[in-house]
């Protein structure tokens, strides 16, 4: 993996050097694009460099990895702005994923004493959710083979958004008011837990820390993450869930932008120059 500006060297000259000393050749050379700012390329002399370490310290490595892999097409240049990054974190991570996990675990705790129930009574929305959940792994794997990381993540988020819609369709809070609908409620809660378990596997190559946090809340942190398990939809029953702090707290965009501008700075640096001298003074200089 090299910058796109040095692909030629690493695909022609470097292999030739390796061949001359009979060393193994690289099987594939990948060139990544540039992350650009509104003023063009980042430059230390201009003082417009974004420090990834500071972003990780503030938002976590998983959030930054997700943004970079989801926002930019691998191999192409991409424009970076604080607004785009923060909105992506809020909408995708806090709203879609984080809220889904929090709501599901909270409902299992409230309506079934924190125990993931078995399937008892299925309806039409269940089959659609299961089909999307079990079919996502093959799509993600295919995109990964093509280094289409953004599309792979979009496939996972299609499942996440479908699961959020499933909550609105089934309305567990309404089912919980009618004891006669307990079997239906158990099935809904089970399906939600299964969908989240599936997500925890699918995001593992991209966001392993987040995956672990989700599995901890589902009570399966001690179980190995197996890719093929994402193609199954009946693996949970009897696990004790545990709600914890939000995986991705919602961000105040305006406040965060102010903090980021303080952290990174956006002013262009100019070199220091000495005061100019007159022609008469210059004539006095001995240049021998």
Sequence positions of predicted segments:
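NTP-dependent nucleotidyl-transfer catalytic core
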Residues: 1-4, 21-27
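Short active-site loop/helix that positions an aromatic residue
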Residues: 11-21
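Beta-strand segments within the central parallel beta-sheet cores of soluble alpha/beta enzyme folds
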Residues: 28-31, 215-217
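Short, charged/polar, low-complexity loop and linker segments
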Residues: 77-82, 134-142
């Amino acid at each position: 993996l090299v910058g796109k500006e040095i692909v030629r060297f690493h695909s022609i000259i470097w292999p030739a050097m390796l061949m001359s000393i009979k060393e193994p050749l690289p099987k594939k050379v990948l060139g990544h694009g540039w992350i650009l700012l509104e003023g063009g390329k980042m430059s230390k002399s201009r003082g417009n460099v974004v420090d990834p370490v500071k972003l990780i310290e503030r938002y976590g490595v998983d959030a930054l990895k997700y943004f970079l892999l989801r926002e930019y097409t691998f191999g192409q240049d991409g424009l970076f702005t604080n607004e785009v990054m923060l909105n992506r974190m809020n909408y995708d991570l806090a709203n879609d994923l984080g809220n889904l996990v929090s709501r599901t675990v909270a409902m299992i705790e409230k309506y079934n004493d924190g125990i993931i129930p078995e399937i008892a009574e299925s309806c039409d929305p269940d089959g659609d959710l299961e089909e999307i959940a079990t079919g996502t792994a093959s799509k993600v794997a295919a995109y990964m083979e093509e280094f289409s990381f953004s599309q792979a993540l979009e496939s996972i988020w299609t499942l996440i958004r479908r699961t959020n819609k499933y909550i609105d369709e089934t309305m567990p809070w309404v089912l919980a008011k009618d004891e006669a609908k307990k079997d239906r409620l158990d099935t809904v809660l089970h399906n939600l837990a299964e969908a989240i378990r599936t997500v925890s596997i699918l995001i593992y190559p991209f966001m392993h820390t987040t995956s672990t946090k989700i599995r901890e809340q589902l009570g399966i942190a001690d179980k190995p993450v197996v890719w093929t398990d994402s193609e199954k939809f009946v693996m949970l029953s009897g696990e004790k869930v545990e709600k914890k702090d939000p995986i991705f707290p919602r961000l105040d965009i305006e406040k965060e932008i102010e903090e980021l501008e303080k952290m990174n700075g956006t002013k262009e640096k100019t070199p220091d120059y000495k005061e100019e001298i007159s022609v008469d003074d210059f004539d006095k200089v001995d240049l021998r």
